[in-house]
Every structure is written in structure tokens, then in C-alpha cells.
Amino acid sequence: MGFLDKLLGSTSEAQVKKLMPMVKRINELEGSMEALTDKELRAKTDEFRARLNNGETEDDLLPEAFAVVREAAKRTIGQRHYDVQLLGGIVLHQGRIAEMKTGEGKTITETLPAYLNALSGHGVHIVTVNDYLAERDAQWMGKIYKFLGMTVGCIIHEKDNDERREAYACDITYGTNNEFGFDYLRDNMVVYKSQMVQRELNYAIVDEVDSILIDEARTPLIISGHGEESTDMYEKADRFVCRLERGENIVKLSKSDQLMGVEQPESGDYMADIKARTVALTARGMEKAERFFGIDDISKQEYSELNHHIQQALKAHALFERDKDYVVQDGKVLIVDEFTGRLMLGRRYSDGLHQALEAKEGVKVERENRTLATITFQNYFRMFRKLAGMTGTAKTEEQEFQAIYDLDVVEIPTNKPLARKDLNDIVYTNQKAKFNAVVNEIVEVHKTGRPILVGTISVEKSEMLSHMLDMRGIKHEVLNAKLHAREAQIVAQAGKYGNVTIATNMAGRGTDILLGGNPDFLARQELLREGMEESMVEEATGHADTDDEEILAARGRYADAYARYKADTDAEHDQVVAVGGLHIIGTERHESRRIDNQLRGRAGRQGDPGSTRFYVSMEDDLMQRFGGERVRDLMQKISPDEDIPIEAGILTKQIEAAQKRVESYNFDIRKNVLQYDDVMNRQREIIYGQRRRVLMGEDIHDSIMEMVDETVSLRCAQFCPGSHPSSEWDMEGLRTEILNITAMDCGRDIAGITDAEKLQSAVKDFAHKAYRIKEDGLMQAAAQLGVDADMRELERVVLLRAVDEHWMDHIDAMDQLRQGISLQAIAQKDPVIAYRNAGFDMFDEMVQGIRERTVRNLYHVVISAGAPQRQQVAKPVETKGDAPARPKRIEGKISRNAPCPCGSGKKYKQCCGRDK
């Protein structure tokens, strides 16, 4: 806390103070709400909706609505909102971020603003980090909403379109950021309105908002379809890369060296910059590539595709580690989320990187995907009318939340004072000494009976530590991406006396670690083991009035089991508190202070005692990439003996300073990504907006005829320009081109015309006549075949398909443009401005292409007895970008719609790429 904060109080304290009168008003209403019957309490929902329709605002209703939700929670799930949870709810309703520490009840807090904002009927999205939490919270908190007469839906990966549509139509919809984002993209790919699943983006509450809006902001959501290219080249590139020798780490040149033109020293066959996540062949490596692939000069444009494959193979070997960045299961490469440690099932890296990893691991190489639609979380969530979020760790990123999302952060005070002790880091020179020390501390603390949670950054490290504990005879549980199925069970019991748990970053965000164990979880598990259906277990844990004998019997069984386990866990809770509570050991500092704080936050919930300690070595990724030399010099001054660990507050501060440098570096990258994506986002808004108007049934016949007029006018200007005498016109060329477009000969209609305006008018009249003839012919053919046909709907379908085909090509072209635009910086031009200008020129070209494709297809469409019926839109492959997304080298693939690199001004497919 800064000097002024100490003197004047923090901004958050001032905000909380301003909100306290509202909390007092809610508390004053508690007695009157308790006096209402269940029916009267439920009737409040209809009353509030009527009052909104009569001109009152959500702010007017807030005190009473929050009091109603608090009372409903007491009657359904047996929990009462604390005052700090009311504060959090008010902050969320205001469209801000509530920073609430672990164990302070974020899940129940969100019910207050969710109910209030759902009263308008426009829907509320509650966003979680995984399917398990979405389903759990929808069932658990859903009891409150349903009691008050509201509908609750849940979107998880397995649901089909009909189930998704039903869930989105509910008052409140739970789901993950990935599912919401992909559904948005899919909705903008459908051909019929009935295939859409989402409705308007009204109000979103994002749980673990830092994880979703910051950690995952650089990773674009991509829907892909399979490409047509062979996978052989990936395997060949991998065989080549395996023969290469890696050079020394790239040395950063001083500014004076850069100004003097000193070149980067090269060694080996390729260089890899771990910090910047880039790879490059050296001159020696290029020579080896030319010999291996039998080519003369690999830098030639014709070998750009080969260069691309080599680049991705180098990345796969130099930048991506098995059991850290990905795992191999059942012959497939599965991505590990670097922030949560969970497997990202069904997701693939884009741009051929996933295929390169498959070739590296010797599993079947799947075909490369083609991007059909893409968006970043930054731009998806900025589309909501109102956005709010919760997390235990947001203050460190407040600047970014304000700059990108216009969200401020309010720290909500804890319900009870924090009793956790955060101990100084212990620093070692190497990882072997560090992990030996970690195991020794686990053994010593375990003797006291204190539960221990050990955080690791990778599957590999968690398995290594597990093996070391086995050697010492310490019984323990392991929670990582390979063993995620028992996550809830392991985390729920991690606070029991004497338990030792090793976890990657997944560490059960959203599941509280209760000292002594979780009686509710234990009672539920007992009922499930006895054969009770999961839906009945949910009913058994509810409190709503019912006369259903089966539910009442289930509640009796749950109450008995809960009471038994509660007696045991309460006694064990006191036992664990007596020995010092949960002890957290971090085996490595993460790049982000927030991830470390999340691990720390597992201990000391609701005033319980606890302690945390991080072990660091100079060989850790963070220390090697950022600030290693500074800390190493400091260690030498404090203690020159490399075998003796150092524990000092000044070292901890230096490590946190290194983390701040990483956070600043990553923030700059995310800002850069956003600058580029904002260009694409504006184009996406235009295309998707117009597409949606067409989809919603807008009559586009007049627009189609305008497209016809524009298309034939361009042809007239091309073959018979008014600036030239008619003797120089190419009338035969115009006649042939109009025949190609309309499938009818306009020779008679334009014969003898020598005035440009009259010629253009005659061609337009002919095109309109040809269109009417085509429409009449289609309707007659449909009637003869007994097929339902509607020309207006046919126009919509043809236009939408033309939009989709050109938009997909445009995405590829824009990606290619972005990969090469960094060269503009060399020419002293702002690459973002150059990208924007070139991008909008390409956008104009695409729009013209859509018009021409639509017109041609409408004149040539035929109806047959085997015409396809309406189908559910297929679910294409969902992929992640090459995270973290960074500018790529120019040696990439050339999109067929990109400008040809030869400088002709034509598209690549119409020039050098004609025969490819």
C-alpha cells in the first residue's frame, strides 16, 4: 500500500464506505422478507417485473431484490448472504470487478446481481472456467432462482444445438467462456435463423475474471474446417529438425551495438528465444535444409510453404515441452492449459503447430485446419451491454482491466480477519537442491499432522515430486491434467488432518478446501455410492417446500449422513486449527503474481490459520527468462556458498520485481494483439451485422438487384468505357461476360448502341429481364418436381454462402498480411496503421467479391429432386491459436486471395499461384 493510501485510505475503502448505506437498507428489509410465505416471496418476481415495465429502474429495485434473494437462499440452500457478499453483489450490478478472497463465497454472491438483472427478460450469462463448475453452480444456485420463478440453463461441451438453444432462452445461463465464444461464432456461420442458439449479449458475470479476461486474452477462439493438404511434409520437416544442433541462447545486444549495426552472433543450426517464443534457422541450418530437401535457395518465395513447416517443427521441439505444454494420451496430443493445468479436450493449436507436435511425438498426424471463424475473448466480452467479474486476485491487473475493458476493481473486505502467514521465499542455485528441500519440509510438516498442499507448474514436476515422496514413504494424492477426473474429491478432502496433496495450477479453483474435510461432499458421495441418482441427490440437499415422499426420504438420508460426517469434520477441524492449519508450498514462482496468490489463497479461508512458502531455484523458467542475473548477483553478495539456501525479504522483492516485468511484457503483447484484432473486429462487426439482418428475414430482393446493377455496370465500364469512343469498345467481350454472368445472350439488346449511358441502361434492363426469367423457370421446375421453393429464401441462402466463402478467404488473407506487416517497421512505418489501411482495402475487395459471387450463383442456380434439406449446422473443429499469440515470421503460407508477392497488383491465385 502506498503512502497516500495509508494516509487517506485506499480507493476501494472509499467505494465500500459509499455502498454501506445500501447494505444497511437491505438488512432493514430482512425481517419483512422472513415474514412472507414461500408463495408471497415467489410472487415478488412478478411484482418486480411489473415495476420495471412501469418505469422503475434496476437500481430502484436493488435493496428489495437483494433482500428477496437472501431470504430465498436461506430457504433453499440453507445459507444467508453476509454483508460483504451484499457489497460484492452491488459492485457486480454496477458493472465492476469485485475482488473477494478465497472462501468468501463468490458463488453465492453472484446470485444477487444475476437475479436483479434477469428481471428485464434479456438474459444473464454467468461465466465459469470449466464445465464442472458451470454444471455444479447451475444446479446449486439454480435452487434459489427456481424457487423465485426463474429459469436456469447450463451450457457444457456435450450439449447439442437444441439443448443449447433451450439453455440460452433461460433467464440465467451458466457456461464456460469457451462454449459461449464458440456458440457466438457458430451462430454467425448458420444459413437459417432456426439454427441459431444464442440471443442478445446483455449482462455477463465472469467468475475468475482474471483467468478469462487476462490470462486467456491472447488466445483467439478459432473454428476450423479440415484443409486439403497432405500431412507428409510435417513428418519430413520433423525428421530434418531432429538432425539439427541448437545454438547458444540469443544474446541481447546493447543499444550502441544495435545502432552500430553489430549483427547477432550465430551458433549451431538454429536459434531459439524462449522469452519471445521465436525460432530461426542460422545460415548453417539453411544450408543443411537445402541439402536435405534438395533445393537451391530456401529463402526463395517458392519455398515459403517448406519454410513454414520447418518453423513449426522447430517450435515443436524448442519451445514446447511434453507433460508441461501438452500430454500424449491414446495416440493423441492434448493441450494443457498453462493457466489452469487442465487438459483442453477437443482443442488444437492452429497454423500447423499441432501437426508438428504430432510428428514430433510419432502419433498420427491429422490434416491441417482452415480457419472458418475467429474472435478473441477481449472482443467477445466487450460486446456485452454490461460486464462484471469476480476473483480473489485482480488488483495487480487493475490497469489492464481499466485500459481494455473499462472495468475498475473494488476490494471487498473479508468476513473475518486474515490469519494466514506468508513466509519469505527460499532460493537455491539449482532445482535438485530445491526439490530435496521441498521434500524435507513436507516430511517435517507432515509429522505435525498439518495438511499440506504442494503447487507445481507442470505435470512432469508433479510426477517427479510424487516419486520422491513415495521414496520417503509419504502417502499423498496427485492432481494434474492426467488425473483430473477426481479433482473435486481430492480438493474437497485436501484439508483433512495429515493429508498431503500435490497439484498443478488447476488446484481446484472454485472448490473450497475446508480444514478437517467437507461434510457436504462426503454425505453426497455416500448417497451416490448407495445408488441414489445424481438428480435426486440435488433434491436431497435442497430446502424448498415439497410433499414428494421420495424427496423427503432422500432428504432424511442426506441429513443423517451429513450429521455423522459433520461431527467428525468439526472435531477434525479443531484438531487441524490447533496444529496451525493448511500449509501451502509453492515449488516455483509463476510468471504471474496472481497465479501465486491464487495458490496462497487456498489457505486461511474464513479466518482459519495457515501458512505459505515458495521455493525458488535459479534454474526455474522465470529466473532464467527474467531477472536471473540480478538475483544471482544478490545471492552472491548475501552468501557466496552455492549449497546454502537463502531466505531474505529482499530476495522475495527481487523475484516479485521479475514477475512485474513479465506482467508488463505480457500486457504489452496483449495490447498489441488487441490493436491488430480491433481492425479485424470492426470488419467482423460489419459482416456479422449484415449477415444477421439477412438471417432474420429482411427482404433482400432490392439489395440483390442493386448488386446485379453494380456488377453489370462494372463490366460495361471495363469493356466499353465512356471515356473512349465507341469504335474502341469491346462489345463482343462485354456480350461474352454478360453471358457468363446471366447465362443468357444480350447481343440483340445491346446491338447498335454507341452511347455509354444508354448501353449501361440497356444491359441493366437485360439483366433484370434475365433474372425474372430465371426466377419463373426455377418456380416452374420446383412445381414439377414437387419441391417447396421460395425465391426470396433462395436469395438469402445464396448470399449467406457467398459471404461465408469470401469471409473465410479474407481471414486467411488478413492473417497472411499480419504475418508480413512487421517489415513495415523496418521502413519506419507504424505496422498497425499499415495493417489497418491494407486490411480495409482488402475488405473492400472482399465485399465486391461477395456481390459478384452472389449474382453469378443466383443466375446459375438449379433445383433438383435431390436438393438438400435443412440440416443442423455442423460443429467444426475448435482450435486455439499458437498461444501465446505473437507476430510470426514472413516465411508463411500465401493466401490465394492475398496480393501476389511478385508486385503485379493481382491476387496470388490470379497470378503466380494460378497453377498451385
List the predicted regions and their residue ranges:
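A generic alpha-helix preference that emphasizes hydrophobic side chains
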Residues: L4, F66, D171, H354, ...
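A short, cysteine/histidine-rich metal-binding "knuckle" motif
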Residues: G892-A898, G903-K916
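Conserved P-loop NTPase motor core
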Residues: M1-S617, L622-I638, G689, E706, ...
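Short, Lys/Glu-rich amphipathic helical modules
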Residues: G449-S462, M696-G697, I750-T754, P901
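Extended, charged helical/alpha-beta scaffold domains that provide interaction surfaces
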Residues: Y326-L334, T340-R348, V577, H583-I585, ...
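Generic detector of ordered secondary-structure context
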Residues: L61, E302, Y349, T393, ...
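Hydrophobic, well-ordered secondary-structure elements that form the walls
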Residues: V454, I502, W807, F843, ...
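Active-site-adjacent structural elements in folded domains
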Residues: E110, V438, A885-P887, S895
